[in-house]
């Protein structure tokens, strides 16, 4: 027998680290039972942003932070038999009223209209695709108040170099 769980630790329940604890405990108690994640995800809206993303804020940045953690968490638990991100696309959900848009679930990696790929989409592309690419994260986050910002990219390349005004800033 095998089992998969729908868990949203770090989204509905505070604490991304709880995913590691839960998986380790399950494996300790049931060392011979294959474990999978049949649903995991966090809502992210490409029009909501934060320099300090936090659980439940529906920002594109928190959704990316959540998925970054989960992919690394899955790597730390090689005995998982399957993981299933929830969901490829945002979708209608009549009874929902979260994130400022009633009737929608924004856990997708791509918007409901299939037009906008969220930053989290490119995280998975970096992990899984062989197509060469670089994606600059938070590029829709234009109304900022910080003096300095961190530039984050997702890429499947060995290295990426950042230039601004012809000057090399980072590699």
Regions found by a protein language model. Name each.
Residues 1-171:
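Extended substrate-binding grooves/exosites of carbohydrate-active enzymes
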């Amino acid at each position: 027998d095998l089992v998969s769980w729908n868990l949203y630790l770090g989204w509905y329940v505070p604490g991304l680290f709880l995913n590691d604890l839960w998986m380790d405990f399950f494996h300790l108690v049931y060392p011979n039972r294959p474990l999978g994640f049949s649903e995991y995800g966090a809502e992210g809206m490409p029009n909501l942003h934060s320099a300090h993303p936090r659980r439940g804020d529906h920002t594109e940045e928190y959704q990316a932070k959540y998925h970054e953690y989960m992919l690394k968490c899955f790597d730390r638990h090689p005995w998982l038999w399957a993981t299933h991100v929830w969901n490829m696309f945002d979708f209608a959900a009549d009874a929902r009223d979260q994130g400022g848009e009633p009737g929608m679930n924004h856990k997708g990696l791509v918007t409901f209209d299939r037009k906008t790929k969220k930053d989290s989409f490119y995280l998975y592309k970096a992990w899984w695709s062989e197509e060469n690419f670089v994606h600059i994260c938070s590029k829709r986050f234009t109304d900022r108040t910080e003096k300095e910002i961190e530039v984050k990219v997702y890429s499947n390349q060995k290295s990426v170099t950042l230039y601004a005004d012809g000057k090399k800033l980072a590699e």
